[in-house]
A protein has these predicted regions:
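Short, glycine/acidic-enriched loop or turn micro-motifs at the edges of active sites
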Residues: 119, 141-145, 192, 242-244, ...
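Active-site histidine-anchored catalytic micro-motif
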Residues: 105-174, 184, 276
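Solvent-exposed alpha-helices and their adjacent loops that cap or buttress functional pockets
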Residues: 3-6, 128-131, 153-154, 176-180, ...
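Catalytic cores of soluble, metal-dependent hydrolases
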Residues: 2-17, 23-111, 123, 129, ...
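A general structural motif
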Residues: 168-169, 186-194, 220-222, 262-267
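Alpha-helix-centered segments that form part of catalytic cores
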Residues: 178-188
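Short, glycine/polar-rich helix-capping loops at beta-to-alpha or helix-loop-helix junctions
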Residues: 193-203
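Active-site flanking residues adjacent to catalytic metal/cofactor-binding acidic residues
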Residues: 115, 139-141, 188, 238-242, ...
Length: 314
């Protein structure tokens, strides 16, 4: 075991939420990742670990309201299915933001376990509340940069990066919006992007590296570029959607897309982040144990987290 002296504490918080997509089961992701030995693995590589448990995620049937607007008000703002379950998602993200802010203010590393990717709004808002404006490396098959106006589905897990970049307005509250800058943002591993997202990527000035770019450049040069861009922020935040990997590597995700990162490519990306010394926070999204095979995807998530954090902030 490596020495723990001088290393920050890693504080884990789970977000058992599947309200942002249209397939159930992602809410069990935090349990699946923990079951795969996350705390033991991080302890073995020399970190002190504190697990804060899970935040509460309300069921839509509870009829809760947030930020002085009721569900009916949000539904009246737009015609059609523009932001499903937004009230409960916002409430969960606000609670997550409060926890992440406490962790970051203490100088520790937030490690957020999902849960669907809409939770990223809360993670980045929490960092902002703590005075942190990190660059973001968003590794994902999808852009997650739709707004309520551009979304074809109304699924909020396709909107969190747009909200964090300030591209989305109502029904998302102001304190979740504009928490990071497109100049320091990178999308890596893209292979399924909606038409409206293409425009939003350009509008925000985000650096986008598709799987075609990775095939052409190689993962190493692509990741070097990502770190160079995101590293200009206040450290780097890693937002890793497990569907960035090829379904042969990570079958337990809700929106699999063929042609993703290989195991070795994903490991190299994490190793390069560790070597950069700039990683300050991590979230793992979209692990779905119901769709997994013998918890393979959750176990892989543990490996990748360990690789990303192994040599960070010595």
């Amino acid at each position: 075991m490596r020495r723990m002296e001088g290393r920050p504490v890693i504080e884990i918080v789970g977000v058992p939420m599947d309200l942002g997509g249209n397939r159930r089961g992602v809410d069990m992701g935090p349990s699946g990742i923990r079951y795969s030995g996350l705390v033991t693995k991080l302890s073995e590589i020399g970190f002190r670990v504190r697990d804060r448990g899970n935040i509460h995620v309300a069921d839509p049937d509870e009829g809760l309201a947030t930020h002085a607007y009721k569900r009916v008000d949000a539904e009246r703002m737009f015609k059609g299915p523009r932001a499903h379950n937004v009230t409960e998602i916002v409430r969960a993200c606000e609670e997550l933001a409060s926890v992440v802010a406490d962790i970051a203010r203490a100088g520790n590393i937030p490690l957020v376990l999902g849960g669907d990717h809409s939770m990223a709004m809360g993670t980045l808002a929490g960092l902002a509340r703590a005075g942190k404006r990190p660059g973001v490396i968003w590794i994902d098959a999808h852009g997650d940069i739709n707004t309520p106006e551009t979304t074809p589905s109304g699924n909020v897990h396709g909107m969190p990066f747009a909200v964090a970049l300030g591209l989305a307005g109502d029904p998302f509250p102001a304190d979740l919006r504009g928490t990071t800058s497109g100049q320091h943002g990178v999308l890596l591993g893209l292979r399924d992007v909606d038409p409206g997202e293409r425009d939003n990527i350009k509008k925000a000035g985000v650096t986008a590296l598709t799987m075609a770019d990775i095939d052409r450049l190689g993962l190493g040069p692509a990741m070097e570029r990502a770190i160079a861009v995101a590293g200009k922020g206040d450290g780097i935040h890693l937002s890793l959607d497990m569907d960035a990997l090829d379904p042969d590597e990570a079958p337990g995700v809700g929106t699999p897309v063929r042609g993703g990162l290989t195991y070795r490519e994903a490991q190299l990306a994490m190793e390069m982040l560790a070597a950069s010394g700039k990683l300050r926070s991590v979230e793992i999204a979209e692990v779905n144990p119901i769709l997994d095979e013998s918890n393979r995807t959750a176990a892989l998530a543990v490996e990748l987290v360990a690789s990303a954090l192994d040599e960070t902030i010595l």
